[in-house]
Amino acid sequence: MKVRASVKRMCDKCRVIRRHGRVMVICANPKHKQRQG
């Protein structure tokens, strides 16, 4: 899980979602998981 000020899709499988007011990226590739913070 990467914590970044700016979350961006890293590939075409990445999905940008909101969970509990946080912007997150979920993907089939675990290396692409990101959270805004």
Swiss-Prot record:
GO terms for molecular function: structural constituent of ribosome. InterPro entries: Ribosomal_bL36, Ribosomal_bL36_sp. One of its GO terms (biological process) is translation. Pfam families: Ribosomal_L36 (PF00444). One of its GO terms (cellular component) is cytoplasm. Keywords: Ribonucleoprotein, Ribosomal protein. Transmembrane segments: none annotated. HAMAP family: Ribosomal_bL36. Belongs to the bacterial ribosomal protein bL36 family. This is Large ribosomal subunit protein bL36. The lineage of its organism: Bacteria, Bacillati, Cyanobacteriota, Cyanophyceae, Synechococcales.
